[in-house]
Amino acid sequence: VIVVLGILAVTAAPQFINFAGDARSGTLDGVRASMQSASTLINAKAKVQGTDESQTTDATNSPTVSNNGTDIAVAYGYPDAVEIDGLLDINAGDFGVVYETGTDAEEVSSTLIYAVGQGVPEADATSGCFVRYSEPTSAGSKPEYEKIDDGC
């Protein structure tokens, strides 16, 4: 009887305990924290350079902040959505990127960083396994960092 219960426990437990999903969700927490740190750093540099209240108008006239010799386009002092993935030190084998366009098809309004192997989310997805960075939309506003992990 004890052996049978042991076998049942070993075969049934993985169905109730989602270690892999919890690990992926935890990794997304790290990605979100990295996004927050990177955008806070760029915002501090934007304030020093006086571009913290400037709006990104288009790809050719964006205000920029110099970061380690690279110009980073900013929207109201925070990284433009298309720039955020370049500021993160993430492995391309583990994570993918999807850009969501706003009302202007040329302008990216948010970026999704998703866990590879969990399906590529649509740009406007509301479920899956990803972190969405949305750039600020007005002076004084801050970017949004949304973790979606119901598909991990």
Where are the regions a protein language model picked out?
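Short, contiguous, well-ordered secondary-structure segments
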Residues: V1-V3, L41, S141
